[in-house]
């Protein structure tokens, strides 16, 4: 694309994998702007958490922004990453410089003022789009991600700005709800507190605000875009989303994964390997067994690399664990999450010493080695907007055993690159596992599936082109969805 056609796009996000992340949102927020930079000038706005401020990357203050309602004044700094990606940091120590995650303290308790913290992020994005940040760069389109950035399109609309916006739903279940009593401190107009606006069963919903006031809504897979218009997956917003879909304002664009996920070159692996070099893959398996204190074995090794939350269907994995062990399999589990889920994983490992191992926490190096060393990846998610682990696993020759939902349905070919099951039941899960055991017993079938999985085209090009088309269409119209605000 010629320089004259390059447009200025601001990503608004609460996570960026280079600096701070809790899940896939951080990965996407870091990878997609880089994948698009040959087409557009894409920059990122993120809060100034300690992990950002203390990252070792120089930050140059470029502007100051005043307060609004209960939202405090703040500064905007510019951080230039080594590869050229420009990050704008929203500096407000009273809101962001706290120990813990972007959303919770060190004990896992959500910050009580999250509505203030992320409303300030949304307002800063609107101020950026209005040219109020003293910078030579002003976005022509704002692309906001998930509920923490949900008020970015909303403030833009309430302030009468015509800059188009996109809101991407990464997980509809996390909605950012707060009492309607907070409307005054957030500067929300009464006219926005309606079923067509951000009102949600007597509360205010940040994610609904993003969807209500953005020019267009995207989700991270085509199947999930359809699913969220149904009661099973719509989280109470299915009617609202069906209305958006009917107007052509909802679409699904799949995530990709970056080129570092290559078994032949990944610097994290114990042993590199290529398709058909399965003895070299087994060296990674030996490492995983040692790390998780599993017995030496020639049976299949199943991996769980996951947030430990109800969504991920871990209770179903507990329900099939004995079946896996009785058939000669082993399970290695890594992740962190809800305390009760973490304890359930510890109890599972205690039930099957040497056959099931668990490490509470997350380490990307070990996660990569688990994908490389395992034969199968377990992903019995109740819903999965996109999912990245199943793509990582396939790149490393680990075949997913997963529920047929969301992005899993879009990225796993049943019986070709993995095994899908339809119902969130132990019975349905077990049937898929039995198919996996049957394939494992026939090395020629197993290796053929591994080769096909490793060749699957999970690059960012599949996302870049649809987003580029959407950006072009919105910028051409340069109008937002009709509204009275």
Curated annotation (Swiss-Prot):
Pathway: Glycan biosynthesis; glycogen biosynthesis. It catalyses: [(1->4)-alpha-D-glucosyl](n) + ADP-alpha-D-glucose = [(1->4)-alpha-D-glucosyl](n+1) + ADP + H(+). ADP-alpha-D-glucose binds at residue 21. InterPro entries: Glyco_trans_1 (IPR001296), GS/SS (IPR011835), Starch_synth_cat_dom (IPR013534). Its EC number is 2.4.1.21. One of its GO terms (biological process) is glycogen biosynthetic process. Keywords: Glycogen biosynthesis, Glycosyltransferase, Transferase. GO terms for molecular function: alpha-1,4-glucan glucosyltransferase (ADP-glucose donor) activity; alpha-1,4-glucan glucosyltransferase (UDP-glucose donor) activity. It comes from the Bacteria. Gene3D superfamilies: Glycogen Phosphorylase B. CDD domains: GT5_Glycogen_synthase_DULL1-like. It is an enzyme of class 2 (transferase). Belongs to the glycosyltransferase 1 family. Bacterial/plant glycogen synthase subfamily. Synthesizes alpha-1,4-glucan chains using ADP-glucose. This is Glycogen synthase. It comes from Pseudomonas syringae pv. syringae (strain B728a). The lineage of its organism: Bacteria, Pseudomonadati, Pseudomonadota, Gammaproteobacteria, Pseudomonadales. The gene is glgA.
């Amino acid at each position: 694309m010629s320089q004259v056609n390059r447009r200025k796009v601001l990503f608004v996000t609460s996570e960026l994998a280079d600096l701070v992340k809790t899940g896939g949102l951080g990965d996407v927020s870091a990878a997609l702007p880089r994948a698009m930079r040959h087409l557009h000038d894409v920059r990122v706005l993120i809060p100034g958490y300690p992990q950002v401020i203390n990252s070792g990357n120089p930050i140059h203050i470029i502007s100051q922004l005043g307060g609004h309602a209960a939202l405090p004044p703040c500064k905007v700094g510019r951080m230039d990453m080594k590869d050229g990606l420009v990050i704008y940091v929203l500096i407000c120590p009273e809101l962001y410089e706290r120990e813990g995650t972007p959303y919770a303290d060190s004990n896992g308790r959500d910050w009580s003022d999250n509505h203030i913290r992320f409303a300030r992020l949304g307002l800063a994005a609107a101020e950026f789009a209005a040219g109020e940040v003293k910078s030579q760069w002003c976005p022509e389109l704002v692309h906001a991600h998930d509920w923490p950035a949900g008020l970015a399109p909303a403030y833009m609309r309430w302030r009468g700005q015509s800059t188009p916006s996109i809101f991407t739903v990464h997980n509809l279940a996390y909605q950012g709800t707060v009492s309607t009593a907070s409307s005054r401190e957030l500067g929300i107009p009464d006219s926005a507190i309606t079923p067509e606006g951000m009102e949600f069963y007597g509360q205010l919903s940040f994610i609904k605000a993003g969807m209500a006031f953005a020019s267009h809504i995207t989700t991270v897979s085509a199947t999930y875009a359809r699913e969220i218009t149904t009661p099973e997956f719509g989280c109470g917003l299915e009617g609202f989303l069906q209305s958006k879909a009917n107007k052509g304002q909802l679409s699904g664009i799949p995530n990709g994964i970056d080129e570092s996920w290559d078994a032949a070159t990944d610097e994290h692996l114990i042993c590199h390997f290529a398709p058909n070099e399965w003895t070299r893959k087994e060296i990674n398996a030996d490492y995983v067994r040692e790390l998780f204190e599993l017995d030496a074995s020639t049976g299949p090794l199943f991996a769980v690399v996951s947030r430990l939350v109800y969504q991920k269907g871990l209770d179903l994995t507990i329900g099939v664990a004995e079946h896996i062990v009785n058939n000669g399999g082993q399970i290695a589990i890594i992740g962190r999450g809800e305390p009760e889920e973490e304890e359930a994983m510890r109890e599972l490992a205690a039930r099957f010493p040497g056959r099931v191992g668990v490490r509470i926490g997350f380490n990307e190096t070990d996660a990569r080695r688990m994908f490389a060393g395992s034969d199968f990846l377990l992903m019995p998610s109740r819903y999965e907007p996109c999912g990245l682990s199943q793509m990582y696993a396939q790149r490393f020759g680990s075949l997913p055993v997963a529920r047929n939902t969301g992005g899993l349905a879009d990225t796993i070919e049943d019986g070709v690159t993995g095994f899908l099951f339809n119902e969130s039941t132990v019975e349905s899960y077990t049937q898929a596992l039995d198919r996996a055991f049957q394939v494992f017993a026939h090395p020629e079938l197993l290796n053929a599936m591994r080769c096909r999985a490793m060749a699957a085209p999970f690059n960012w090009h599949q996302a870049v082109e649809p987003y580029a088309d959407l950006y072009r269409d919105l910028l051409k119209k340069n109008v937002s969805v009709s509204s009275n605000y």
